[in-house]
Amino acid sequence: MKKTSLLFAASSLSLGLLGLSGCGNNSSVATVADADVNETVILRFAYASNSQPVIDAMNEFGRLVKEKTDGSVQIQYFPDGQLGGERELIELTQSGAVDFTKVSASALESFSKDYSIFSVPYLFNDEEHFFKVMDNEEIMEPIYQSTKDLGFTGLTYYDSGQRSFYMVDGPIHTPEDLKGKKIRVMQSETAIKMVELLGGSPVPMGSDEVYTSLQSNLINGSENNEFVLYTAGHGGVAKYYSYDEHTRVPDIIIMNDAIKEQLTAEQEKAIEEAAKESTVFEIEAFARAIEEEKALAQEEHGVQFNDVDNTPFREAVAPIHDTFKNDPAYKDLYQKIQEQGA
């Protein structure tokens, strides 16, 4: 059992205060425990900073939950990292201080080794392969359930696009261009190993530190989808985006299991359906918005985009694939994913 952090204590207090201010004198608003005597259950959804299509999808989830439960369950949001970064939000969901969060699969690696598979570079042949895997319940349900003993499980995924390198001082064409470069990566052992194999120097850090680190030359570049360029402003200092497309790491919505068990079967089913339907909404919204983001990055920041032959990148990171396909803990899952792309 993890020790309660100071952030958790502070967040619990703020949640209590926010809950009181949100409820006011309306006796129809209740916690799950009071649901048998009151009309509406309020469930709390906290999330870190996100692109607009993802925010819209999370709001659509709340709308669908309210609609499908005839208003008996409603979602209250704590946006933009008010309660902490992704690691803290997972812990808050685990403890029941909040009921839902949405985080990168990479952030879940330290809670379940199964999520590490998504950080394997070039795991998917293309976008079609990615969606085929993510929509396969035989593959995904065991991954979602892999954290059940920790008090939470996955509900659904959101598309977060492909991840490529973007740099301050010039484009990337081959792995040689990364040699000696300090590259920000997510706090993932697999992502760190990937950059090392490509010749770079990985610098693990949270997303909120990247802009100032690029600006101060603490790092030479980073890797992410195109939304960081205009929406997060990174294109103002890192103007070279190179499509090596090394990973497609999904976002995952997780839910506290103790809360789920207090809901009626009908309410639980409604939440599960709403989550899946919000995924369809998010995928469509993300695809539309990414093109707008690229155009704005070019127009407002002068970002240059270049295509890359990723063959030498794939060859360089082959040892990571060897590790996963030979490790007893991963080989069955790895094989199932590869079969979907055959």
Q: Where are the predicted features?
A:
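Bacterial N-terminal signal peptides that target proteins for export
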Residues: 1-9
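Hydrophobic helical h-region of N-terminal Sec-dependent signal peptides
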Residues: 9-17
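Residues in and immediately flanking transmembrane alpha helices
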Residues: 15-16, 139, 195
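C-terminal motif of bacterial Sec signal peptides marking the signal peptidase cleavage site
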Residues: 18-22
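N-terminal secretory/targeting leader peptides
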Residues: 24-128, 147-342
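A gly/proline- and charged-residue-enriched helix-loop-helix capping module
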Residues: 129-144
